[in-house]
A protein has these predicted regions:
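Conserved ABC transporter NBD signature motif
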Residues: 63-71, 79
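Catalytic Walker B motif of ABC-type/P-loop ATPase nucleotide-binding domains
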Residues: 159-162
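Conserved catalytic motifs of ABC-family nucleotide-binding domains
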Residues: 155
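The feature captures the beta-strand-to-loop junction immediately N-terminal to the Walker
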Residues: 40-42
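Conserved ABC ATPase "signature" region
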Residues: 103, 107-130
């Protein structure tokens, strides 16, 4: 008998309402594991709101959603173990070093051998030479590269990207694409 493989993301009639405004309206999708999905639309169309609901930063008003088989309403903490999020908000601590920032997240997620993983990712995003510098001294592009490393620190099953190329130069876009593949 074949094992059933849960979709990476599955939603059914997912909605998010703010007052009288439906930011997300009855979205039903199924994304298989290993797939890429892009959502395009004009400003205010609900793309970021959908991402926030799927990444457990906001709760849906109605409908259902699972991530790697985990119901987002029933067990958002367990769902977060599967999620990496790259957003235009860096989620970094500006007064800490690059290395300290990644170590916080590595320990938070229970990464085995966090020191090695931090150095591996700092090298991958070409920031190893700046590992002891505080984040506030970084350019926008460097901060975004460190945010990429932060999102990948625990090798998540699903990575949500909200304007991932924002602030990246062409070389950094190549680095990013290689890491996501």
């Amino acid at each position: 008998m074949e094992a059933v493989v849960e979709p990476a993301i599955k939603t059914k009639k997912l909605s998010k309402v703010f007052g009288n405004r439906r930011a997300v309206d009855n979205v039903s999708i199924e994304v298989p594991q290993g797939a890429f999905l892009s959502i395009f639309g004009p400003n205010g169309a609900g793309k970021t709101t959908l991402l926030r609901v799927l990444s457990t930063l906001s709760r849906a008003t109605s409908g259902s959603a699972t991530l790697m088989g985990v119901d987002l309403k029933e067990d958002p903490d367990k769902a977060r173990d599967h999620i990496g999020l790259i957003s235009h908000n860096s989620m970094l601590y500006p007064d800490l070093t690059a290395e300290q920032n990644l170590m916080i997240y590595a320990r938070l997620y229970g990464v085995v051998d966090p020191e090695a993983r931090v150095l591996e990712l700092l090298e991958a995003v070409e920031l190893k030479h700046r590992r002891l510098d505080v984040v506030r001294t970084f350019s926008r592009g460097m901060t975004q590269r460190l945010s990429i490393a932060r999102a990948l620190i625990h090798d998540p099953d699903v990575v949500f990207l909200d304007e991932p190329y924002s602030g990246l130069d062409p070389h950094a876009v190549e680095i990013f694409d290689d890491l996501i593949d």
